[in-house]
Amino acid sequence: LVGLAFKVSAVPFHMWTPDVYEGSPTSVTSFFAIVPKIAGIAVFIRFMYSPFQNILDQWQYILVFISIASMILGAVAAINQKNIKRLIAYSSISHMGYAIAGISTGTESGFKSTMIYILIYSAMNIGFFAFVFLMKRSGKYVEEINELSGISKNHPLAALSLLIVLFSLAGIPPLAGFFAKFYIFMSVIESGMYTLAIIGLITTVVSAFYYIRIVKVMYFDNPKKPFESFKDYGIYGSLIFSSIFLASFFIYPSIFNEIISKINVF
């Protein structure tokens, strides 16, 4: 449990995450934010579903503690962050708390909801970092939130795409991030873990603040020096595609659940 919690940056094994995210090149940060999380959660599910399911009572409360601590610390610590990569570090800690909440139920529906959550989380992070890769001044990627001031005036489509990604990260309906959290909370409630569900809902509201703050900077602050023209259309396409996926997910929200059922993961 300690090794896996460290892998996914869950509290109290999260200490390395903010400094590593902020100090690493943006390309490395994007890797840390996506790939290890997918792998770590997949291994988490594999171990908890099969070898350890018969001893649920011995590890469930440990995961509940890790989940609650991660959701609270991630949501609260991110509020005053001004560096984009440091903010996304605390955001990832909070999101891993939600994912672990699903695992802590020890049920098939909880494991499925966590798989769906991590897939949607990955799509949201792909969109977020695609935006960051596009934002360059003098050959340097954007680092601080205030550097995005008024960007909607110069890059309206990119700003709109990031708005969709941020609202999805915040869990605002009808975006994909809302359904990701909805499935987690439903599996938690079905398992009778009402306190965990309530804390998850409260931290969701708190975390919405720092996502909306970025939107406020983009749309309502005075514009700064424009960023360089977009030259990598592959990355631009990734941003647009991820935002379309997140915005249109409500049309067929059961797609991941059906795929997981068909391939007999459980």
Regions found by a protein language model. Name each.
Residues L1-F266:
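Alpha-helical transmembrane segments of multi-pass membrane proteins predominantly involved
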